[in-house]
């Protein structure tokens, strides 16, 4: 487990009953003491005595609100990379603060992952691909080489993005969807050749 952090205590912002929160506790707790703070309590107390990571992923509006507060107040965040994941080094992959990378991922050389992302297990982020801030990928997602993904995007289980595809902000790709061409409008996409099915 690789954790980039300072010496302050760690708070996971999330719900104790959430499986995502429990995954964060299990991994970070192997080497650090952690406590969970509910989102409503964080909104009342953004103490600079702590460093944070955001485990809220179901209510995406709530997640974005929390992240905006963290960034606007310049609160310290931690970055977690599971030691079973491979991260390219020449040229290096760049992983921004606040991101959590689950086990058995391959983060290829020259790739870039923005702030506050959650990269699910068994993901492949291809060579020179770029993910914006606050992207969440579920298990077994593939983002192929030289693709660009905007901010606040969600990729559900076993969805794929083919080479050199560009995706705008605020896109949800449903499970088993294959994105083969650029996505130029935000919304929800599904199908073997991704098509837009709703606004959000």
Residue ranges and their predicted role:
Residues 1-133, 141, 151, 169, ...:
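Domain-scale signature associated with acetyltransferase and cell-envelope carbohydrate enzymes
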Residues 138-200:
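Glycine-rich hexapeptide-repeat left-handed beta-helix
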């Amino acid at each position: 487990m690789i954790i980039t952090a300072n010496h302050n205590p760690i708070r996971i912002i999330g719900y104790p009953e959430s499986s995502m929160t429990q995954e964060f506790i299990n991994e970070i707790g192997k080497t650090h003491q952690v406590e969970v703070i509910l989102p409503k309590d964080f909104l009342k107390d953004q103490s600079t005595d702590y460093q944070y990571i955001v485990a809220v992923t179901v209510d995406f509006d709530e997640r974005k609100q929390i992240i905006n507060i963290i960034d606007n107040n310049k609160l310290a965040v931690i970055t977690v990379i599971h030691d079973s994941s491979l991260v390219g080094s020449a040229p290096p992959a760049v992983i921004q603060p606040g991101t959590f990378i689950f086990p058995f991922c391959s983060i290829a050389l020259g790739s870039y992952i923005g702030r506050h992302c959650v990269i699910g297990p068994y993901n492949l982020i291809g060579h020179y691909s770029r993910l914006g801030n606050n992207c969440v990928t579920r298990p077994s997602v593939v983002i192929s080489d030289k693709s660009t993904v905007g901010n606040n995007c969600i990729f559900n289980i076993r969805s794929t993005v083919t080479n050199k595809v560009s995706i705008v902000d605020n896109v949800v790709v449903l499970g088993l969807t294959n994105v083969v061409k650029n996505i130029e409008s935000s919304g929800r996409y599904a199908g073997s050749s991704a098509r837009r099915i709703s606004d959000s």
